[in-house]
């Protein structure tokens, strides 16, 4: 457990349309509603969530620990525990709880870049795109790290500003991005083009040699998924099925729903069993008019 996510490839960004499941927590996870949260007056703010007792703060990775050493020892330990708790909450799928932990960490150590990074990525995961954008802008100013730009651009998409997303991506030459961030930037740019009703342009952005990468990188399933989803939007169903299948082959953990999309093309549907379970638990009349009572035992 690292405590603070490292760079945008650790965050969920979206390659489809706002509201799609990219099928995009990483370019490719379920997007949120993009609502802007309202800052509460200080007296109305909820208390910080309790940190689980088993979290010591020593679980934090070296990069984060190095930055936290700029703080007084006791404060640094508290912030480390908050960041580890946030990381655990994200792993458990509770983005709102992660955001609460990182908000408290920011209150205590808002001048530390990894704290702002953690809050930005937690807000992004929670669908609070306005907060995520503000925090990641701050990280970019503090560190000069351009690898956050794809996530920032995806926040603009979440706020229904696809043109701003494209403008932001255009500010940074691909040569200034890491290999992973370059791919994430293309996925987000393609999503923005689709938002603007330009699926052909989106497809061109995604037609890169990395689609056929032999090594399984974190971004490969999301890239193939975005490509397949764009093909499907263009009505190229046979090609789309091929690429959804190729995405599923490199997505054993199911970060995307590529396997389900393949099944849909094959005419297989998945039904929620929740309603059936509820029905099974409902009390039934002792004597149903449609059922003959059995013999007494």
Feature map (PLM): residue ranges:
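Basic Arg/Gly/Lys-rich low-complexity intrinsically disordered segments
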Residues: 1-75, 271-297
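Alpha-helical segment of the N-proximal tetratricopeptide repeat
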Residues: 70-114, 118, 124
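Generic helix N-cap/helix-start motif at coil->alpha-helix transitions
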Residues: 43-44, 75-82, 108-116, 143-151, ...
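Structural motif corresponding to the intra-repeat A-B loop/turn of tetratricopeptide repeats
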Residues: 92-93, 126, 159, 196, ...
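TPR-repeat structural position
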Residues: 95-96, 129, 162, 199, ...
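Residue-level signature for tetratricopeptide repeat
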Residues: 88, 120-122, 153-155, 192, ...
């Amino acid at each position: 457990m690292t405590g603070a996510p490292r760079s945008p490839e650790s965050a969920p960004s979206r390659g489809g349309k706002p509201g799609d499941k990219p099928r995009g927590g990483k370019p490719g996870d379920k997007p949120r509603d993009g609502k802007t949260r309202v800052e509460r007056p200080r007296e109305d703010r909820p208390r910080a969530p309790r940190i689980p007792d088993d979290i010591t703060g020593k679980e934090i990775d070296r990069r984060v620990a190095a930055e936290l050493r700029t703080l007084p020892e006791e404060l640094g330990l508290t912030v480390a525990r908050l960041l580890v708790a946030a990381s655990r909450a994200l792993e458990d799928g509770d983005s709102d709880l992660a955001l609460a932990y990182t908000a408290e960490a920011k209150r205590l150590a808002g001048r530390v870049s990894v704290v702002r990074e953690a809050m930005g990525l937690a807000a992004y995961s929670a669908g609070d795109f306005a907060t995520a954008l503000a925090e990641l802008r701050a990280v970019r100013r503090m560190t000069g790290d351009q690898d956050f730009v794809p996530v920032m651009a995806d926040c603009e998409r979440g706020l229904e500003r696809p043109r701003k997303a494209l403008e932001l991506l255009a500010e940074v030459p691909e040569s200034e991005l890491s290999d992973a961030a370059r791919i994430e930037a293309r996925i987000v740019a393609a999503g923005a083009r689709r938002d603007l009703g330009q699926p052909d342009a989106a497809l061109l952005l995604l037609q890169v040699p990395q689609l056929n990468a032999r090594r399984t990188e974190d971004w490969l399933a999301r890239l193939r998924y975005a490509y397949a989803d764009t093909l499907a939007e263009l009505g190229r169903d046979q090609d789309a099925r091929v690429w959804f299948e190729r995405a599923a082959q490199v997505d054993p953990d199911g970060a995307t729903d590529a396997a389900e999309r393949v099944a849909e093309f094959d005419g297989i549907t998945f039904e929620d069993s929740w309603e059936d379970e509820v029905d099974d638990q409902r009390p039934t009349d002792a004597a149903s008019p449609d059922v003959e009572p059995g013999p007494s035992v």
